[in-house]
Design a protein with these regions (language model features):
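Residue-level signature of mid-helix packing/kink "hotspots" within the transmembrane helices
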Residues: 22, 50-58, 142-143
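Helix-loop-helix hairpin linking two adjacent transmembrane segments in secondary transporters
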Residues: 91, 95, 133-178
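Cytoplasmic helix-loop-helix junction between adjacent transmembrane helices
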Residues: 99-138
Length: 209
């Protein structure tokens, strides 16, 4: 049904970021040896990804409120794709760290915007049901990605992990084009602003609870 298709597409989009983390973990020792980097520098490639995927979600929410859901989703996936290709071609650890930060910013679109789409489409029990289906698809990534990563590394080396992740980004772009409808109306967009979002964030930060 259309309902299940939407849950599958949104779940896969949400899983792209975690997929890029979990599939990458088995590659850390090989990356250190290949690029002549110490353990701390290699672990930094993971830290900056977590940092940027968190920061990015704060940005994509209000931006998608103002311009619609699909444009920032396309932009984020395209950024993720380009950064993944850059990671696959990186020749030193500093470049890889920088590109992992950019990759996380792109992946944040897949984490934040599908949840906003669910809220646009449904409320109450229907929203909870769609979100639970989305999370079910999302939860498969931490189980399968490390196994897939280990297999890819054994066959083709650590750089191949990023090529596989880049292919996932292409599939995400295609799924967005074919399977995701714009759910934010022009009238709703007019009611949104970055200033309003910033004010809401400040209110949350001031809340002692």
């Amino acid at each position: 049904s259309r309902y299940l298709q939407m849950a599958l597409v949104l779940g896969l989009l949400s899983a792209i970021g975690p997929f890029a983390i979990d599939m990458y973990l088995p590659a850390l020792p090989d990356i250190g040896r290949s690029l002549g980097a110490d353990v701390g520098s290699v672990q930094l490639t993971l830290t900056v990804f977590f940092l940027s995927i968190g920061l990015g979600q704060l940005l994509y929410g209000p931006v998608s409120d103002m311009v619609g859901r699909k444009p920032p989703l396309y932009a984020g996936l395209a950024l993720f794709l380009l950064a993944s290709i850059g990671c696959a071609l990186a020749t030193d650890i500093h470049t890889l760290v920088a590109l992992r930060f950019v990759q996380g910013l792109g992946a944040a679109a897949g984490m934040a915007i599908p949840r906003a789409i669910v809220r646009d489409l449904h409320t109450g029990p229907e929203a909870a049901r769609l979100m639970s289906l989305l999370m079910l698809v999302f939860s498969v990534s931490p189980i399968l990605a490390p196994l897939a990563g280990s297999g890819v590394i054994a066959v083709a080396g650590w750089r191949a992990v990023f090529w596989v992740v880049a292919v996932a980004a292409v599939l995400g772009l295609m799924a967005t084009w074919k399977g995701v409808e714009e759910t934010r109306t022009p009238e709703q967009r007019l009611d949104s602003s970055l200033g309003g979002a910033l004010k809401a964030y400040l209110t949350l930060l001031r809340d002692p609870h």
